[in-house]
A protein has these predicted regions:
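Short hydrophobic alpha-helices and adjacent helix-cap/hinge residues
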Residues: 1-181
Length: 181
């Protein structure tokens, strides 16, 4: 999913050369997975990748100051709860940086990031419920097939794009499941 997410973002921000990730450090398995996948994808796309770890919300200012010194072009905000559930604390730093940003959840784009691309959480919860019903009905968990997400949500925050002077290509507008005004 990191490849698709970064590929869509690259189409929105074609001049991207240096991407910074804002996320918890030391990170959980989710943050480490996001970081490793982004590092790999950035290398494949020829981008420089920088990680700006935060232990707590009070570290955001320092992380963004470091990113300013490193002259990053854009930000990926981790889906970790530290950042994703505290977007009201993250967005002011993103806005002040005047850099495009993206994250893994629709709610992050709704909060002000330029875009998000993720599996549809509602669909995932529905599938989890169906699995639970099968298990409660007597099915052995080991006998159930592993399913991957099949429904994804691509959101573009048009208001943020305008504020950053980014013209969203018509091809991306056509792909977007949600356009936030």
């Amino acid at each position: 999913m990191a490849q698709k997410r970064l590929g869509l973002f690259k189409q929105l921000v074609p001049g991207l050369t240096r991407l910074g990730m804002i996320g918890p450090e030391p990170g959980s398995p989710l943050a480490a997975s996001e970081r490793d996948a982004l590092r790999k994808m950035c290398a494949q796309f020829g981008f420089d990748f920088r990680n700006y770890g935060v232990v707590g919300l009070d570290d955001l200012e320092g992380a963004f100051a470091s990113a300013r010194r490193d002259d990053v072009d854009a930000f990926f905000v981790s889906g970790e709860p530290l950042t994703s559930t505290n977007m009201s604390r993250v967005i002011p730093f993103i806005a002040t940086s005047e850099k495009p940003s993206f994250g893994p959840y629709l709610e992050m784009a709704q909060a002000g990031l330029l875009m998000s691309y993720s599996s549809d959480l509602s669909d995932g919860f529905r599938h989890a419920g169906l699995y639970a019903a099968k298990i409660l009905g007597g099915a052995k968990p080991g006998d159930l097939p592993i399913e991957q997400a099949s429904k994804f949500t691509f959101a573009i925050n048009i208001k943020t794009a305008r504020a950053l002077g980014i013209s969203v290509p018509p091809t991306l507008l056509a792909l977007a499941d949600e356009m936030i005004e």
